Design a protein with these regions (language model features):
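Flexible loop/turn segments at secondary-structure boundaries
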Residues: 47-50, 79-82, 143-146, 280-285, ...
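Beta-strand elements within well-structured catalytic alpha/beta cores of enzymes
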Residues: 37-43, 70-73, 121, 137, ...
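Alpha/beta-hydrolase fold catalytic core
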Residues: 218-271, 280
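Conserved small/polar residues in nucleotide/adenosyl-binding loops
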Residues: 296-303
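Long, well-ordered early-domain segments
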Residues: 75-76, 85, 93-142, 146-147
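An N-terminal structural lobe/cap that precedes and organizes the functional/catalytic core
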Residues: 24-71, 79-85
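N- or domain-start disorder-to-order transition segments that initiate the globular core
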Residues: 2-40
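Long, well-ordered, tryptophan-enriched scaffold segments
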Residues: 113-116, 127-137, 142-244
Length: 306
């Protein structure tokens, strides 16, 4: 007779490992085994669920305090997370037109659990020199309007002539600032990428002048170029979203993975990152219909734990 195959429940029960309660100090200690990884991916089954957020915060705090993790990268828009990063690393405040994380869904990041973690990061960093402080970064591409404002503010301060040119180029997207998806419909109707060339030219101009700009402030240049990359990818994202979910989903995941790679390169060989994102982004998607994910697109999977 053929051997009896275990049920899904039996398989899960055999693999599952009991954990202490979230508030128990031993809960986070159970994850010390991952302290040697360079990237730890912490998922969630649903956005805004307190238990997931508290668990990730406890694990991340342990990895930062005991194992030297230097970055927290989350499924959030770059310019919004950058405002939090400046706060937790005690950097100069650069006001946004609107407060961070006010774009739907606000409850995803504007909640008590995230606030408590942000307060921990600020206290933790306040006791350390600038080079040893842990940063907070966004991997996602949705807040195109805030990224445009950030790029223009940066160029206004270092290269007013380039700022004027970029302002004209980004003006192509201005009619769609309140509803970016409308740009995709417009581009689809007209049959061409109306704003692709202007936004790519702005990014390329910044990269060509990298040596000049970095002399002013390397961190601010990195932030500005990340915003410029977000604008370029968001333009493409909203343009192709009407061609099918797979195309836009994979573009978004590729953007997040590329951002993660740039963060790690910018942070240096000793940088260690904790990633917070939905399971659909950081799980292994090889056997799903989505095709790519942060883990699957990596060519350095040995450094990843999720």
């Amino acid at each position: 007779p053929e051997p009896v195959q275990p049920t899904i429940v039996e398989t899960l029960r055999a693999a599952a490992e009991p954990l202490p309660a979230l508030d128990d100090t031993e809960f986070a200690a159970a994850f010390d085994r991952f302290g040697g990884a360079r990237v730890v991916l912490l998922g969630e089954a649903s956005h805004g669920t307190s238990e997931f957020y508290r668990a990730r915060a406890a694990i991340t705090r342990r990895l930062i305090e005991r194992h030297g993790f230097t970055m927290v990268a989350v499924e959030a828009d770059w310019p919004d997370a950058a405002a939090i990063d400046r706060h937790v690393r005690h950097l100069q405040h650069e006001p946004m037109r609107t407060p961070p994380f006010t774009r739907f869904p606000t409850w995803m990041w504007r909640n008590r659990d995230v606030d408590a973690f942000v307060n921990f990061l600020r206290r933790h960093n306040g006791e350390r020199p600038q080079a040893e402080r842990t940063g907070f970064y966004g991997l996602d591409l949705y807040n195109m309007t805030a990224s445009i404002a950030a790029v223009l503010a940066y160029l206004d301060s270092v290269d007013p002539e380039a700022a004027a040119i970029a302002r004209r180029r980004y003006g192509c997207l201005e009619p769609f600032s309140r509803e970016p998806a409308a740009y995709g419909r417009e581009a689809l109707t007209k049959g061409y990428a109306m704003c692709e060339e202007p936004v790519m030219q702005s990014l390329m101009d910044m990269l060509r002048k990298q040596l000049d700009y970095v002399r002013h402030d390397g961190d601010r240049f990195f932030d500005a170029t990340q915003n410029a990359r977000l604008i370029a990818d968001a333009e493409r994202y909203y343009r192709i979203m009407y061609y099918g979910a797979h195309h836009s989903w994979n573009l978004r995941d590729n953007h997040m993975f590329d951002t993660l790679q740039r963060l790690m390169a910018w942070g240096g060989k000793d940088s260690k990152v904790v990633v917070w994102a939905h399971n659909s982004h950081i799980g292994d998607a090889r056997y799903t219909d989505m095709g790519t994910c942060l883990l699957y697109t990596s060519d350095a999977a040995d450094d990843l734990l999720c």
